[in-house]
């Protein structure tokens, strides 16, 4: 990288962060009343600090509404909330329980009705947060969770989608989520040792018992999706998808469109990279999931800053923030896409919730697509072990 390019990288990242903070601060002031629950308890600290004074029985009141989209036949808010970061996935350890319960309720107040968690997040802790937070409004929200990993001594182990394990996982999730049914149950990762047809039959039985309403797959290949759908119609498929990872467009999107299946992208802001939250010289703590991801290694990170600069330029053009632009771009790809950005901070929640209001025209999308095709990206999206769990059949 030339000195000039390095200087441009160094200058642009703080500028993006300043702009993001400025816009978020404005949103926080304008929506200050939204931080209060119906009882007057603080829902989440706008400065992003954990709070512990919000009573767990506070009933949230929905003050904002988002447009809705359909995942198959399941109607949800046009954006969901991913609840993985709350357990310390990106470092810092699990967040304060009351603060996260408050944050989830604040998301509902912002119009979000679609919440994504998993048995293995924590493990179990994320489901507990979601269950406690949404119990007062259970009939007004859609809760998605996942099975597919063994959990021993509080730690995830190997892939496990055996029928008996699925049933045990679902019973545990129902208890932690404080509900009698799961709206959307995903297989977290396809298990090469269990035919997907056996998995589908097991979930079909759970649906017949009323414990599950819809089902989906995560990081599944087009072939696996078709096999699963032939046994039990699939409602949604989840995968990583963002400006820097567009592989699902090649084989997954055509399959989903043909079969009428929705798509739920996780990490739609590239693990906060497109939010301007990462700088070229940043080094990640060993507790931060990004510390061993190829695209976040020093050399790759520095070279990939050109993508952030691109998002920043478009954010200025659209009078929005880079993260809102990134989310709006994801949503503009198909009408059956519902991203689930995660956060642990109220200002970021407010910022994310504004993305559905950002409109990109067809001509703008073509212009963006042409530009992205010319941006070289360095490093894979996952470490070798995680990569081995993705279904590529």
Where are each of the predicted segments found?
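Glycine/proline-rich, positively charged
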Residues: 152-247, 251, 261-262
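N-terminal small/glycine-rich loop or linker at the start of catalytic domains
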Residues: 72-90, 144-157
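N-terminal secretory signal peptides
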Residues: 1-17
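Terminal-tail/helix-coil boundary detector
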Residues: 22-23, 45-66, 258, 286-313, ...
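N-terminal twin-arginine translocation
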Residues: 15-21, 31-52
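Conserved, mostly hydrophobic/aromatic
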Residues: 71, 81, 115, 130, ...
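Aromatic-lined glycan-binding groove of carbohydrate-active enzymes
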Residues: 248-283
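Glycine-rich, proline-tolerant flexible connector loops at the mouths of alpha/beta enzymes
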Residues: 117-132
């Amino acid at each position: 990288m030339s000195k000039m390019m390095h200087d441009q990288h160094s200058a642009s990242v703080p500028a993006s962060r300043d702009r993001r903070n400025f816009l978020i601060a404005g949103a926080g002031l304008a929506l200050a009343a939204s931080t209060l629950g119906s009882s007057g308890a603080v829902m989440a600290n706008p400065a992003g600090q954990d709070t512990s004074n919000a009573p767990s029985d506070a009933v949230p009141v929905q003050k904002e509404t988002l447009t809705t989209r359909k995942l198959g036949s399941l109607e949800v808010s046009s954006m969901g909330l991913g609840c993985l970061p709350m357990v310390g996935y990106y470092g810092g350890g699990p967040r304060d329980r009351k603060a996260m319960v408050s944050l989830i309720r604040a998301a509902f107040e912002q119009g979000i009705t679609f919440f994504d968690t998993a048995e293995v997040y924590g493990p179990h802790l994320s489901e507990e947060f979601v269950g406690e937070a949404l119990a007062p409004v259970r009939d007004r929200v859609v809760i998605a969770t996942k099975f597919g990993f063994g959990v021993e001594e509080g730690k995830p182990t190997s892939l496990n989608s055996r029928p008996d394990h699925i049933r045990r996982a679902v019973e545990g999730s129902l208890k932690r989520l404080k509900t009698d049914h799961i709206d959307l149950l995903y297989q977290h990762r396809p298990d090469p040792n269990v035919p997907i047809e056996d998995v589908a039959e097991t979930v079909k039985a759970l649906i017949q018992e009323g414990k599950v309403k819809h089902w989906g797959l995560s990081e599944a290949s087009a072939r696996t999706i078709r096999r699963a759908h032939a046994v039990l119609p699939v409602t949604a498929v989840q995968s990583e998808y963002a400006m820097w990872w567009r592989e699902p467009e090649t084989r997954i999107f055509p399959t989903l469109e043909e079969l009428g299946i929705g798509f739920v992208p996780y990490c739609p802001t590239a693990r906060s990279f497109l939010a301007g939250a990462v700088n070229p010289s940043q080094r990640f703590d060993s507790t931060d999931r990004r510390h061993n991801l190829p695209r976040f290694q020093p050399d790759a990170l520095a070279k990939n800053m050109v993508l952030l600069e691109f998002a920043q330029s478009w954010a200025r053009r659209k009078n929005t923030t880079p993260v809102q632009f990134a989310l709006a771009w994801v949503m503009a790809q198909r009408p059956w896409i519902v991203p689930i950005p995660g956060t642990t901070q109220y200002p970021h929640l407010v910022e994310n919730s504004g993305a559905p209001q950002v409109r990109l025209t067809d001509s703008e999308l073509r212009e963006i697509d042409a530009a992205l095709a010319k941006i070289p990206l360095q490093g894979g999206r996952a470490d070798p072990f995680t990569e081995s769990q993705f279904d590529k059949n």
